[in-house]
Design a protein with these regions (language model features):
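Conserved ABC ATPase signature
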Residues: 174-216, 220, 224-237
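Phosphate-binding glycine-rich loops of NTP-binding sites
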Residues: 1-26, 208-209, 214, 244-245, ...
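Short, mixed charged/polar active-site loops
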Residues: 50-52, 75-78, 192-195, 288-289
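Short beta-strand segments that buttress and anchor functional surface loops
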Residues: 40-45, 184-186
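Short, hydrophobic/aromatic-rich segments at coil-to-beta transitions
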Residues: 33-42, 63
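C-terminal lobe/lid and adjacent interdomain/linker elements of RecA-like ASCE P-loop ATPase modules
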Residues: 240, 244-326
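Electropositive, glycine-dotted interaction segments
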Residues: 51-175
Length: 326
């Protein structure tokens, strides 16, 4: 799901691999899906606007693409663009879309201008262009960390808040090597320092060095951060700390959002996450996999989970479903 959402967002950057891959991509669990389009339906908020984006693609072509907008609490609503087959409608709020022809394999998201004079179009374009994605393999090589002093200090302070003694970092180019090396400065209790290269760090530290800059950028922009297997190789307390950054209004004044996958039940706790923030995935016998929020799940007694239940314990006991059948 996260990969699919990321590929939709990449359309705004001109990466149309989602569309071109539809020639060979379909749900292999059901042969009838071979004849159906890949369909996406996104609801999101940005700068006071509520947007709905719909996309259907099949065999390397866009069949239908729509963007609707509205302002909650007002009558301000309309269409940014609507496209079906060869019919195309561009709304007044879409701003100038600079194209003479629109190939079937190209998304209209590519032509939304983040610098548009239309606040509505600008909000929609910036949401897509600022989405970030952290994947499990991203920390296998040294990340491209910011060199600006202020950003560097923010990253190091967050690492120190997680009890990691990294005081600073530098990027050096060694003779005979094409790629620059990332060197971390560690502080010792006696006030002395020592230096460690990125490749010498533990897997957990390497993951945090790759993840935390994305967290900082997400909080600064108020953007969506997607993270696959966020809990892997991280201590549960570190995972909780990262979640707390998004839940604290002072640290997250621009309403950034974190959507992640995890197998760690330690965060399934009312003190950490609300019921509507927890989605479980299960595959009922004989049917396709389903994703459902804990806030709408009905237990055997017909009641939804209370907001004071020990979610993690109840989940492991099989009270909420979504456990593997072993």
């Amino acid at each position: 799901i996260l990969e699919a959402l990321w590929n939709v967002c990449r359309l705004a950057a001109g990466d149309f691999s989602l569309i071109t891959s539809s020639v060979r991509s379909y749900c292999r669990l059901d042969n009838t899906c071979r004849e159906l389009p890949l369909s996406f339906d996104l609801l999101f908020r940005r700068n006071g606007f509520l947007f709905r984006y719909q996309l259907d693609v099949k065999q390397g072509a866009v069949l239908e693409e729509n963007m609707f907008y509205g302002k909650p609490g007002s009558d301000d609503a309309g269409v940014l663009f609507a496209r079906k087959a060869n019919e195309l409608h561009i709304g007044n709020e879409a701003g100038k879309m600079d194209f003479s022809t629109l190939p079937a394999g190209v998304s209209l998201l590519r032509y939304l201008d983040p610098k548009s004079s239309s606040e509505c179009a600008k909000a929609a374009a910036s949401w897509f262009s600022q989405v970030l994605f952290f994947r499990e393999h991203d920390y296998k090589k040294a990340p491209d960390l910011p060199s600006e002093v202020e950003e560097r200090q923010v990253i190091c302070r967050l690492l120190q808040a997680m009890d990691i003694d990294i005081l600073d970092y530098s990027i050096t180019k060694e003779q005979g090597f094409d790629d620059p090396s990332l060197i971390l400065t560690h502080g010792k209790a006696d006030g002395n320092t020592f230096f460690v290269s990125f490749n010498e760090e533990s897997t957990g530290i390497r993951k945090l060095l790759t993840l935390i800059p994305l967290v900082v950028k997400s909080l600064r922009l108020g953007s969506l951060l997607l993270a696959d297997d966020l809990d892997n190789v991280l201590h549960p307390h570190l995972l909780r700390f990262i979640l707390s950054l998004y839940q604290d209004h002072e640290k997250n004044p621009h309403h950034a959002q974190l959507v992640f996958t995890s197998h760690n039940t330690a965060i399934l706790n009312p003190a950490v996450m609300r019921r509507d923030e927890i989605c479980l995935c299960c595959r009922p016998e004989g049917t396709d996999a389903v994703l459902y929020p804990l806030s709408s799940y009905k237990k055997e007694n017909g009641l939804i989970p209370r907001n004071d239940e020990a979610y993690g314990k109840q989940y492991l006991e099989g009270r909420y479903g979504a456990n593997p059948r072993i």
